[in-house]
């Protein structure tokens, strides 16, 4: 049976060597929404590789793009840099360049998430001369390109059009220059600052405008597959103009396209670096395991938007993934091909299940125990021989940080002191006494505790939920809490016994 998983379906008819390309303009923090592009590309790359085809995966950093405005997260001092390439602008903090400041944390995220893309800076493509031929072809076909842009986009281009934007050697801007004449390899230009000069297209002394540069990269880098956002794929958008320029100017077929929808931040809208409405990818990778981030992207067809809830949504997502992972490693035949593919493309390490303890339960443990060593002692028994302590300590940190930054109050709790007094009814006391009377003979594990709670609810002809609420009130002073069987098991029989005895004694 052939998998209907979206990535496998897209690449099933490909043949010969393939190159998957993705990219971004590092104009601000590279956020979770941007992860959809590179992870979609990575999943396609892995699907191609799985088919046995020779494949390569690149990630283009458009560091030659100009700073378009002073974004909300920048100081007003950046007004002086508007129009200059991102690679030439100082970083918002510390030494270094603006583009590297936002790119480098994302490169670390790529490594953690097992994304083997080669990062290529657009400035290096220009400086090395790799785009020189494409620049020359584009400039020599400027009237044809102008006609395509006007016809497809529906927008009139005024004045003498050249598909090249020189970098002014005086003011350092790209956005304020225009080409006067061209004789290979030099573009003569004038700038609004009053400077007149020449730019060498064999170097990073200018760039093509985006709608021309994109197909030029397909040509120069031999790109065969590329995912892109819906803004580029809109009617009359840059993919529509790009595929015509690819065919009619560069004489190539455009890459196999895959348009993806946005990631929507719950209650706020689509993420954008320029508006400040975003969670940085490096930030989210501090609070959730990489497999979970990969699964969030893999599970949803790219044509549908993703609702991202960094609060309770993370717990629901982790429950879903862990259930599938259990089946994948223990009884793969129980999964359909689509489900198996989702898990396969989510795993950072395909040889073993990544979570020795599920994320939801780990969130409970970090609130019960004070140290990592205590948590390790609590879970180490019964773990497989390939249990890796260092990896599990990472998981503990994910849970701690998620709890601090994104967990809703309903998930947080504090264990009440063993002698804390609370108000209880006679029926509450009877239920607690019954539980206490049987505690010594009861096997102390989560399943037995869970079953015992249900037995008591039947014996006292009361709703099980009310019994659960009673125990939560006794131990954390709230009406709801973590899964009770696991919770009481990890508190330990001695503490549970002593706490219930004290509560009963106070009445």
From Swiss-Prot:
ATP-binding among keywords: yes
Keywords: Aminoacyl-tRNA synthetase, ATP-binding, Cytoplasm, Ligase, Nucleotide-binding, Protein biosynthesis
InterPro entries: aa-tRNA-synth_I_cd-bd, aa-tRNA-synth_I_codon-bd_sub2, aa-tRNA-synth_I_CS, aa_tRNA-synth_I_cd-bd_sf, Lys-tRNA-ligase, Rossmann-like_a/b/a_fold
Motif 'KMSKS' region location, chain numbering: 270-274
One Gene Ontology term from the biological process aspect of the record: lysyl-tRNA aminoacylation
Disulfide bridges in this chain: none
Reaction(s) catalysed by this chain's protein: tRNA(Lys) + L-lysine + ATP = L-lysyl-tRNA(Lys) + AMP + diphosphate
GO cellular component: cytoplasm
An example molecular function term from Gene Ontology annotations: tRNA binding
Primary subcellular site in the record, as a coarse category: cytoplasm
Keyword Glycoprotein in record: no
Positions occupied by motif 'HIGH' region: 26-34
Alphabetical list of PROSITE patterns matching this protein: AA_TRNA_LIGASE_I
Enzyme class: ligase
Subcellular location, record wording: Cytoplasm
EC number: 6.1.1.6
Protein family: Belongs to the class-I aminoacyl-tRNA synthetase family.
Name of the protein: Lysine--tRNA ligase
Protein source organism: Thermoplasma acidophilum (strain ATCC 25905 / DSM 1728 / JCM 9062 / NBRC 15155 / AMRC-C165)
Gene: lysS
């Amino acid at each position: 049976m052939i998998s209907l998983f979206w990535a496998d379906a897209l690449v099933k008819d490909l043949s010969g060597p393939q190159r998957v390309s993705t990219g971004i303009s590092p104009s601000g923090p590279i956020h979770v929404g941007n992860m959809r592009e590179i992870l979609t590309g990575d999943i396609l790359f892995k699907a191609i590789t799985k088919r046995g085809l020779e494949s390569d995966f690149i990630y283009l950093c458009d560091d030659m793009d100009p700073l378009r405005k002073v974004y909300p997260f920048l100081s007003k001092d950046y007004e002086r840099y508007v129009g200059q390439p991102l690679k030439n602008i100082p970083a918002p903090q510390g030494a270094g360049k603006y583009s590297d400041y936002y790119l480098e944390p994302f490169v670390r995220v790529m490594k953690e998430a097992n994304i083997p893309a080669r990062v290529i800076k657009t400035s290096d493509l220009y400086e090395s001369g790799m785009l020189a031929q494409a620049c020359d072809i584009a400039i020599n076909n400027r009237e044809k390109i102008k006609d395509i842009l006007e016809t497809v986009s529906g927008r009139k281009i005024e004045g003498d059009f050249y598909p090249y934007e020189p970098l002014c050697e005086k003011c350092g801007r790209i956005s304020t220059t225009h080409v006067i004449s061209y004789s290979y390899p030099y573009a003569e230009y004038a700038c609004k600052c009053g400077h007149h000069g020449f730019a060498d297209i064999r170097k990073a002394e200018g760039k093509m405008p985006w709608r021309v540069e994109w197909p030029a990269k397909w040509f120069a880098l031999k790109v065969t597959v590329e995912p892109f956002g819906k803004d580029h794929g809109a009617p009359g958008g840059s993919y529509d103009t790009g595929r015509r320029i690819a065919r009619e100017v560069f004489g190539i077929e455009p890459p196999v396209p895959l348009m993806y929808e946005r990631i929507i931040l719950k209650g706020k809208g689509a993420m954008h670096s320029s508006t400040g409405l975003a969670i940085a990818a490096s930030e989210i990778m501090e609070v959730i395991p990489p497999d979970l981030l990969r699964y969030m992207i893999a599970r949803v067809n790219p044509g549908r938007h993703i609702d991202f809830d960094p609060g309770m949504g993370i717990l629901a997502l982790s429950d879903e993934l862990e259930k599938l992972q259990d089946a994948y490693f223990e009884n793969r035949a129980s999964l359909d091909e689509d489900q198996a593919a989702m898990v396969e493309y989510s795993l950072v390490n395909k040889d073993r299940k990544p979570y020795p303890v599920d994320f939801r339960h780990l969130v409970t443990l970090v609130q019960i125990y004070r140290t990592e060593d205590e948590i390790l002692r609590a879970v180490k028994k019964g773990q497989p021989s390939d249990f890796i302590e260092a990896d599990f300590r990472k998981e503990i940190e994910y849970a701690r940080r998620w709890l601090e930054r994104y967990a809703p109050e309903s998930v947080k709790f504090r264990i009440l002191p063993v002698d804390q007094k609370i108000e209880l009814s006679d029926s509450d006391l009877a239920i607690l006494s019954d539980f206490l009377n049987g505690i010594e003979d009861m096997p102390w594990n989560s399943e037995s505790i869970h079953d015992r709670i249900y037995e008591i609810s039947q014996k006292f002809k009361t709703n099980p939920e009310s019994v659960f609420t009673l125990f939560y009130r006794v131990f954390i002073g709230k009406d709801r809490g973590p899964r009770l069987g696991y919770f009481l098991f990890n508190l330990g029989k001695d503490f549970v016994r002593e706490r219930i005895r004290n509560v009963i004694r106070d009445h």
